[in-house]
């Protein structure tokens, strides 16, 4: 059975120590676009737009222009540009000696950590900023989808009115089987349906056929002990896994390993071209996936 692959990307700097715009966004995106042009395919880019707010706040005009021009290129080439919000940008500080941002303060990592008024202000500003940038190229451009920063879409009840307000019908924040709880992250998708696309209303992990929202989840696959061993023995774990950029990320804390024996348990990994992945295993899992649509992050 042939598969449809949805290529989605979080268009962002590293979110602990940012690294540079040039190395973390501009160069890798340009490589992607060159490949996409050659293969005649399109991608979905979720733009971490609060970065633009901070560039303007600190008067970093050169980076602002480069960032906006890159988004313009995405729109001009027919790629989908959608909303992505990391509110801990509000506490970020620019380190001029390093020419990068310090985002180590994660108190506001999740939108749900904000007061109701601040949450609405941040969401509204982010939506308007991204819409304005896109309309500089296409006056009819409309944002239709959202991905929560760090996938932290739960609890959804505080975000639902804002998606309704701006007529955003699609969410792509659910990663099946995954769970994380730390100072920065919180999500629990362990009960999410393994369905490529579904409607929901008040809970993005529960199907509601009459729901007004559409969930396009990122699927996960299981890496068993035998896969881990073969990856180590034959050097396949991490093939093609080259790190782009010069920053440091905020790593989600999944199931904490309490003993050495827990290292031998199977783990779940998103269908992803980011982070620690085994290319051969990923391709085999995708080929054997029962769903005919696969979303990759």
Residue ranges and their predicted role:
Residues 8, 96-113:
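Aromatic- and acidic-residue-enriched carbohydrate-binding clefts of CAZyme catalytic domains
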Residues 12-24, 50-61, 107-119, 144-152, ...:
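The substrate-binding groove and active-site-proximal loops of carbohydrate-active enzymes
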Residues 148-289:
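Active-site-adjacent pocket scaffolds in enzyme catalytic domains
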């Amino acid at each position: 059975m042939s598969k449809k692959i949805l290529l989605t990307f979080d268009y962002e700097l590293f979110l602990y120590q940012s690294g540079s715009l040039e190395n973390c966004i501009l160069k890798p995106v340009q490589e992607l676009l060159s490949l996409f042009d050659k293969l005649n395919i399109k991608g979905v880019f979720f733009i971490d737009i609060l970065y633009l707010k901070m560039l303007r706040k600190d008067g970093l005009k050169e980076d602002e222009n480069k960032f906006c021009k890159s988004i313009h290129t995405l729109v001009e080439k027919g790629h989908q540009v959608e909303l992505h919000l990391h509110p801990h940008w509000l506490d970020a500080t620019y380190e001029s000696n390093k020419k990068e941002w310090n985002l180590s303060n994660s108190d506001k990592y999740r939108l749900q950590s904000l007061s109701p008024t601040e949450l609405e202000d941040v969401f509204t500003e982010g939506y308007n900023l991204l819409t304005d940038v896109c309309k500089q190229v296409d006056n009819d451009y409309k944002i239709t989808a959202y991905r929560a920063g760090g996938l932290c879409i739960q609890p959804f009840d505080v975000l639902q009115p804002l998606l309704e307000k701006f007529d955003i019908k699609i969410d792509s924040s659910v990663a099946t089987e995954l769970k994380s709880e730390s100072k920065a992250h919180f999500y629990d998708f362990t009960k999410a349906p393994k369905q490529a696309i579904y409607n929901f209303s008040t809970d993005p992990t529960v199907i509601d056929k009459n729901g007004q929202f559409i969930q396009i989840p990122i699927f996960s696959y299981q890496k068993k002990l035998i896969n881990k061993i073969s990856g180590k023995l034959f050097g396949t774990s991490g093939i093609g896994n080259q790190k782009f950029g010069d920053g440091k990320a905020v790593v989600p804390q999944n199931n904490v390993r309490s003993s050495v024996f827990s290292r031998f348990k199977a783990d779940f990994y998103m269908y992803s071209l980011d982070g620690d992945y085994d290319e051969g295993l990923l391709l085999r899992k995708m080929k054997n996936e029962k769903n005919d649509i696969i979303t990759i992050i």
